[in-house]
């Protein structure tokens, strides 16, 4: 039996997340779903998995239940299939932000960030400029270890280790973006949307987010102008441009990402060590 994996997020003002939590938890448990749902004053961020029947019922619930006051009626979901349940339990958490930037919360009532869809972005990258003739720069908003698994060709990568570092690195590197069309991107859209909103707020012009992130881009146009895979935060580790699990894995010992070529190293022992944490590599670095 295939398991349906759903992910989605939406920026919307939520007045009382604590009041929502028990109702959402009860419904998810009744449907036998597992995963995590984050509720914050700025919106919702969710990753859940279950049978086709129950995930369809969950989608209808989120879009139409009176609890949500119509805030999520147009909520779009990214979907993939797996042969087993990727999550071990169902959690509904209350957060200050649905993705942590440590900046004042997004004000959803002011509207979402400008976006570019995958076919349009591919057209821009094919030509080397946008429809107004401005050069296009791709800005990766993910953590460095994710970028190392795969990214867009010639993308800006500021080697951040957590998303809350993003505002500072943008302030330090504004010159890289001047006079260009900036397209921020991430795995599924949430980080690049918040990044685009922040850049607009600090006066950077011609900023877009990639609608739906890398995974939606893969779904609609494949791997054009992209090299490598896309890291995902579940047991699959990484997906290729065909949205299939790749051979990239994570080290059992240190959780470092281990691409196929690194798995050929004698320092990689499945279920134990990798070139990052093997005692021999640590000793060599210390010498």
Curated annotation (Swiss-Prot):
Q: Give GO MF terms, alphabetically.
A: oxidoreductase activity, acting on paired donors, with incorporation or reduction of molecular oxygen
Its UniProt entry gives the catalysed reaction(s) as:
uridine(34) in tRNA + AH2 + O2 = 5-hydroxyuridine(34) in tRNA + A + H2O
Where in this chain does the record put each Rhodanese domain?
132-226
Q: Pfam families, from UniProt?
A: Rhodanese, UPF0176_N
Q: Give the superkingdom in one word.
A: Bacteria
Q: Does the keyword Nucleotide-binding apply?
A: no
Q: Which UniProt keywords apply?
A: Oxidoreductase, tRNA processing
Query: Its GO biological process terms?
Result: tRNA modification
UniProt KW DNA repair keyword: no
Indicate the residues that form the catalytic site: 186 (cysteine persulfide intermediate)
For this protein, the record's HAMAP family field holds: TrhO
Database matches in NCBIfam families: PRK05320.1
- Protein family: Belongs to the TrhO family.
Descriptive protein name: tRNA uridine(34) hydroxylase
Its source organism is: Paraburkholderia phytofirmans (strain DSM 17436 / LMG 22146 / PsJN) (Burkholderia phytofirmans)
Classification from the root reads: Bacteria, Pseudomonadati, Pseudomonadota, Betaproteobacteria, Burkholderiales
Gene for this protein? trhO
């Amino acid at each position: 039996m295939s398991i349906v994996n759903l992910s989605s997020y939406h920026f919307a003002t939520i007045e009382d997340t604590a009041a929502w939590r028990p109702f959402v938890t009860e419904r998810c448990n009744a449907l036998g779903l597992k995963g995590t749902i984050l509720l914050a004053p700025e919106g919702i961020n969710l990753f859940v998995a279950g049978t086709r029947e129950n995930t369809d019922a969950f989608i209808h619930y989120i879009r139409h239940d009176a609890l949500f006051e119509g805030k999520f009626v147009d909520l779009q979901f990214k979907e993939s299939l797996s042969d087993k349940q990727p999550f071990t339990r169902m959690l509904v958490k209350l957060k200050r932000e649905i993705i942590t930037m440590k900046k004042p919360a997004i004000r959803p009532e002011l509207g979402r960030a400008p976006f570019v869809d995958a076919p349009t972005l591919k057209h821009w990258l094919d030509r080397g400029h946008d429809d107004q003739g401005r050069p296009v720069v791709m800005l990766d908003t993910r953590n460095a270890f994710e970028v190392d698994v795969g990214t867009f060709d010639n993308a800006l990568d500021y080697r951040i280790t957590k998303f809350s570092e993003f505002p500072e690195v943008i302030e330090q590197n504004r010159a890289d973006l001047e006079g260009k069309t900036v397209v921020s991107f991430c795995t599924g859209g949430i980080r690049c949307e918040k990044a685009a909103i922040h850049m607009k707020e600090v006066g950077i012009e011609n900023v877009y987010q990639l609608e739906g992130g890398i995974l939606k881009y893969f779904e609609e146009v494949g791997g054009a102008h992209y090299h490598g895979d896309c890291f995902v935060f579940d047991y699959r580790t990484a997906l290729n441009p065909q949205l299939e699990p790749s051979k990239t894995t994570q080290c059992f010992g240190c959780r470092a990402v281990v691409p196929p070529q690194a798995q050929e190293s004698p320092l990689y022992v499945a279920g134990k060590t990798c070139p990052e944490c093997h005692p021999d590599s640590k000793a060599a670095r210390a010498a």
